[in-house]
């Protein structure tokens, strides 16, 4: 092909790209390569009317717009919690039934973390204050039990501790005896009204925890000698007699310590709302002449009889004692103050209350002054009447 010499540069394009290409060229100037290998220099002020439709096309490739999104995930690993302390301490003895349990952690528990468990289970509620967890029992732990505190692994464990619960408090036993009418007293938040009369919740009644309230005498005529023997929460012959009476009714060993067997029987009786099937009797023996015995029952002097007490050297010991053994008839063997050995069979209506001293029937020509070897002797027929009112645990008061 003949050299045509310098030719105006011709480009071919279409549509909207025309304006775009032209603007680009104008803005750039300089050298542009055409499809025929020729170069055009110093293009100036090219507009759409300068484009030769027969020229080779110029292909312009624009790079795509690319957006890259980067997501960063940060994982924070919290250190595991540790148990700093547990109260009551491991192996603690004699822990009160209502004592709270406290678990102190190295930090606040995580949301949704399980609370420690008590085994055997006890009703109550856990509360959280910072890193301290506190369990407050609703009705107390079972007396004489061993409680285990188990901290689960999901909280801060696994870790465990245990403590030993004290026996039933004497005051609580007295409250239950009052509920069951084995005492001449009522117990409750309202003076003169027992928990049973108010239909108190059974869970509260059988709880080993002492309940708030007051003891009040059931009878305004309660003898002064009986009132003087009673102190709430303290050992006394009044409590001993009531327990012996209850044990006899329940066919339990009489006069033993307060133990799990006795406590279980008390709870069962309260839960079934059983009460003492007999009245409250109190026997008062006066050694003032003429000697007599008075049976005080449920607020009134119900029965009186002349009696004989011990002769000098074999005095009937003064004080108050519970009846601990009873016989329709028995043989009495001993030695009197003169050294005479006696062996008397078929002594009737016998109720022992202080060692070898007993209230019983005996055949005498007269009564009302000291004649016995320490016992309280009654006319036989009268002794039968009194025997019907002195069950096991009945208190016998002997005064000078």
Predicted regions and their residues:
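Short acidic, glycine/serine/threonine-rich helix-capping segments at coil-helix boundaries
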Residues: 160-168, 175-268
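Exported/periplasmic cell-wall-interacting domains
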Residues: 278, 315-318, 327, 334-400
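Sec-exported extracytoplasmic/periplasmic mature domains
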Residues: 106, 110, 152-156, 178-183, ...
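N-terminal post-signal-peptidase region of extra-cytosolic proteins
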Residues: 83-92, 119-121, 130-137, 266-282, ...
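Terminal targeting segments of Actinobacterial cell-envelope proteins
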Residues: 1-11
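Extracytoplasmic/secreted envelope proteins and their assembly/folding machinery
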Residues: 98, 102, 146-148, 170-174, ...
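Acidic, low-complexity Ser/Thr/Gly/Pro-rich repeat segments typical of extracellular/periplasmic
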Residues: 12-32, 37-65, 74-172, 185-191, ...
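Cell wall/extracellular polymer interaction/catalysis modules
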Residues: 248-256, 260-318
């Amino acid at each position: 092909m003949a050299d045509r010499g310098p030719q105006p540069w011709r480009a071919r394009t279409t549509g909207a790209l025309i304006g775009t290409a032209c603007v680009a060229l104008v803005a750039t100037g300089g050298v542009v390569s055409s499809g025929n290998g020729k170069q055009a220099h110093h293009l100036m002020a090219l507009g759409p009317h300068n484009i030769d439709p027969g020229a080779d096309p110029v292909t312009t490739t624009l790079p795509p717009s690319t957006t890259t999104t980067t997501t960063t995930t940060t994982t924070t690993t919290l250190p595991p919690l540790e148990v700093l302390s547990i109260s009551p301490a491991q192996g603690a003895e004699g822990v009160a039934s209502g004592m709270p349990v406290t678990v102190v952690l190295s930090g606040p528990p995580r949301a949704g973390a399980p609370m420690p468990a008590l085994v055997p289970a006890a009703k109550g509620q856990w509360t959280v204050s910072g890193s301290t967890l506190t369990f407050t029992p609703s009705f107390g732990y079972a007396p004489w039990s061993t409680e285990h505190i188990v901290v689960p692994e999901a909280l801060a464990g696994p870790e465990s501790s245990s403590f030993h619960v004290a026996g039933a408090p004497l005051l609580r036993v007295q409250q239950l005896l009052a509920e069951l009418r084995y005492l001449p007293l009522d117990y409750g938040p309202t003076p003169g009204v027992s928990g049973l009369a108010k239909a108190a919740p059974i869970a509260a009644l059988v709880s080993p925890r002492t309940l708030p309230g007051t003891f009040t005498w059931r009878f305004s005529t309660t003898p002064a000698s009986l009132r003087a023997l009673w102190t709430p929460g303290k050992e006394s012959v009044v409590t001993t007699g009531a327990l012996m009476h209850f044990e006899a009714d329940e066919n339990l060993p009489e006069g033993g310590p307060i133990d799990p067997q006795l406590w279980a029987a008390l709870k069962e009786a309260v839960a079934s709302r059983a009460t003492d099937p007999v009245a409250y009797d109190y026997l008062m023996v006066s050694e003032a002449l003429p000697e007599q015995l008075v049976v005080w029952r449920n607020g009134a002097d119900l029965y009186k009889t002349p009696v004989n007490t011990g002769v000098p050297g074999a005095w009937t010991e003064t004080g108050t004692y519970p009846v601990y053994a009873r016989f329709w008839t028995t043989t009495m063997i001993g030695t009197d103050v003169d050294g005479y050995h006696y062996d008397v069979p078929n002594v009737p209506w016998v109720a022992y209350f202080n060692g070898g001293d007993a209230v019983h029937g005996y055949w005498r020509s007269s009564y009302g002054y000291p004649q016995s070897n320490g016992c309280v002797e009654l006319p036989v027929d009268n002794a039968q009447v009194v025997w019907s009112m002195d069950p096991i645990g009945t208190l016998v008061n002997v005064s000078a």
